[in-house]
Amino acid sequence: VRPGDPVSVGQDIARRGDCGVAIHASVSGRVTAIQDRPHPWGGSSPAILIENDGQNTPCPQRPQPVEAQNVELPLLLERVQAAGIVGMRGEAAPTWEKLARAAGRVDTLIVNAAECEPYVTADYRLLLERSEKILLGASVVARCLGAQRAVIVTEGDKLRAVESLERRLLRRGHSVQLCTVRTRYPLGAEKQIIQTVTGREVPPGGSALDASCVVLNVATLYAVQDALFRGRPLFHRAVTV
């Protein structure tokens, strides 16, 4: 896009140069400038300034939703990259690259919903309010990667979310498993959660792949299923206020 261009909600307006991940407009309106702005991680970064028109006009070129049984690995990677999905636990690494590296190399998909920090409840609300979609997303991603099992991990004191997931697992006969952990920091960290779920240790300097696992934050997984089954790119998320 260029200054003066109109944009709509969900429109692809830029690409991250290092990985090709798409960046989408979160409002509709008009581009007023493209300039460097302060970045939360320090320094500055190129930014697209959009004057919000308040109309929330949706992008007409939204990808068509797909059926779960029709999702294979190439389509999964294509949709995740086009939707601009990155790790939502803080690292912001391209999710399509993470999935591509894991394909055929893992036996376990771990969906990390363990929020060990005080007062943080965004992942808990996702489990409670979107449990069916999270279960579907986990089963589809695990199948595409060739993983034999998918495990959702949350704290044992999240009783309502645990009960909601257990009801759906029993009713639908999902292949997805549920694992509860103690509410103790840093059990939500990747290496600790892998050891808790599988008993395997990630070697020093290694990654989850060395333990035949791939770990996705539950918000990241929810964004993946949104991209597949609603054609919705990543420009929003649940946060704790």
State each model region's role.
Residues P58-P60, L109-D123:
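Gly-rich Lys/Arg/Thr-decorated short loops/hinges at beta-loop-alpha junctions or inter-strand turns
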Residues G29-V31:
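Conserved hydrophobic positions within beta-strands
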Residues L128-L145:
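Histidine-anchored nucleotide/phosphate-binding helix
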Residues Q148-V241:
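Hydrophobic alpha-helical positions that pack around
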Residues R2-R15, A33:
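Short, well-structured beta-strand-loop connectors
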Residues R15-R16, I34, E51, N112:
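Residue-level recognition of conserved beta-strand edge/terminus positions
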Residues H39-A93, A103, L159-R160, R172:
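Acidic low-complexity segments
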Residues D5-P6, A22-S26:
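Small beta-strand-rich domains/subdomains or short beta-sheet motifs embedded
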